[in-house]
C-alpha cells in the first residue's frame, strides 16, 4: 500500500510521486504476488518477459498519473483498497420469494471533504479504458439495456450499487453512515483540467447516493426477478454488439 491511512496533503503525495524507487518496488512486489502467486512479502522477484516488462512500465506510469490527480484532491483519506461489500435482497418470482446476496469488490474507498460540511465517502472504480460513460438523465437510464453501448450504463450500475451498500452496510469503513458518492476513475482522463470521476445524474454530481436508493433498488430487484423468472425465457441477446466485450460470451457460444 503506497498511501498511509491518514489525512493526506499535497507535499507527501508529491514526494511519493517523485520517489521512482519506492513506486517501482511496490509494483514489482505486486507482480510477484498477484501474477506469480508468490507468498506475501517475498523478496525474490521472477524475471519478466517482454510483455510483462511493458505492463510493469504502464502500471508505473498510471500510478504517477494517479498520484498527480490525488495531489489535487487533498485533503482526503484512503480508507481501503479491494474492499468487499454485499447485501441481501428479497427477490420475487412466480415460484415465490428468495434471498439473493449481491455485491462485489470496491477498488478503493476514499473519505473526501474531511473536516468540512461536505465530508463524505467516495467509492472508486478504476477504469483503464478511454470511453467514459455519458451522463445519465435518470436512474431509469441505468437499467435500459440500450444504454450499455451508448452510455456504458453497466459501469454506472456497478458503482451505484456498491455505493448504496457502502452507505448503509459497512461498519468497518463507514460506521457513521456518511453520505457516499459513486465514482468511475478513468486513468487516462486524470490529466484533464477540472476532471471529476463522480457520477452525474441529470447533470448533478451524486453527493449522496441514498437520494437514488429507492428507485435504484426497485429497478435492480425487478431486473433480477426477470432473470430468475421461470416463465420468462432466458435467451442470448439479439444485439451481437453487446457480446463483443462480455466476459461470459463463451458460456453461450458467442
Indicate where each model-derived feature is located.
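RecB-family 4Fe-4S metal-dependent nuclease core
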Residues: 1-254
